Amino acid sequence: MSASSILDLVREDLRAFAGYSSARTSALQGDVWLNANESAWANPADPDASTRRYPDPQPKGLRSALAALYGCAPEQLLIGRGSDEAIDLLVRGLCVPERDAVLVTPPVFGMYAVCARLQNAPLVDVPLVDGPDGFHADIPAIVAMALSSNAKLVFLCSPSNPAGSAIALDQIEQALQALQGKALVVVDEAYGEFSDVPSAVGLLGRYDNLAVLRTLSKAHALAAARIGTLIANAELIALLRRCQAPYPVPTPCAAMAEQALSAPALEVTRRRIAEVRSERERMHKALVQLPGVRQVYPSQGNFLLVRFDDAEGAFQALLEAGVVVRDQRAVPRLADALRITLGTNEQNQRVLSALQRTQEAAA
């Protein structure tokens, strides 16, 4: 797909959309700023006056740091309020209500479906296949359904939440090739740092119908800062930026995120990722040995999806031990499952101890 034709996937009424021109988007220079109706005084709660001015819509330092981290050009990258905002922008920007479908692969992160329904875009499901080695995406079925349903967006969560499985790059490439000119393939790599599968960002040079979602919420421990990243064709990024709210990145959050991407902070993050991966292996081995545990799915994320003979009993036992996990029982095909985030060694041991006590009491 050429750089110009990627915009053919965008809603016709938005292709020439100029968006809102904020005071910060103008290139004017000066030392007395009276163009945005901001206060001339700092709030007493803000002694450094760091939040008196509206923020840079796309902070240049942070954008450059994120581009270096993810291996793309800054102009291929949009910063938003978590990946949630990027998902919403994609659905609103590409899907005509009641016409252009959004394809998802349940069980999967729920925001894709939420954004589709808010846009009144048809939602198409191609469920993950639950095989002997865990859940996996059926790429031929996904492609066939995307083509037959007029899907404009195909969301591939890799590693998948809550299933934990990742999609090999050659499979993603199959989807990209088959859907060129038809749909944008969005690879959500929120848990990519924990995975053995390389990032799909490396495919951007060959496929303009690819978008990749990344976040600082998981491996980088900045969930409350709400720093999400959309990586895609530069023209598509520029257009979606015009559809975005004027000031999506608060200055304190941008400053914290940029500091988190410094060399010393990244080294700490790398060590913590290694610890999570080690704990993931340990917990998997320990959980499969527990009576009452029916199945522990392989995971490329920072969590494990576990099926229980008595999921309610396991859930309540963990709560009584002060441990809160994600109840998946309302999700189709996961009526006996809990998702357990991998914490510290001590936290994970509390999980094992609580589940062990439950089985001993039931014996």
UniProtKB/Swiss-Prot annotation:
Which residues get modified to N6-(pyridoxal phosphate)lysine? K218
GO molecular function term, any single one: pyridoxal phosphate binding
The catalytic activity of this protein is classed by the Enzyme Commission as 2.6.1.9
Using the UniProt record, name the top-level EC class of this enzyme in a single word. Answer: transferase
HAMAP family reported for this sequence = HisC_aminotrans_2
Q: Which family does it belong to?
A: Belongs to the class-II pyridoxal-phosphate-dependent aminotransferase family. Histidinol-phosphate aminotransferase subfamily.
Instruction: Please identify the protein, giving its name as recorded.
Output: Histidinol-phosphate aminotransferase
Protein species of origin: Xanthomonas axonopodis pv. citri (strain 306)
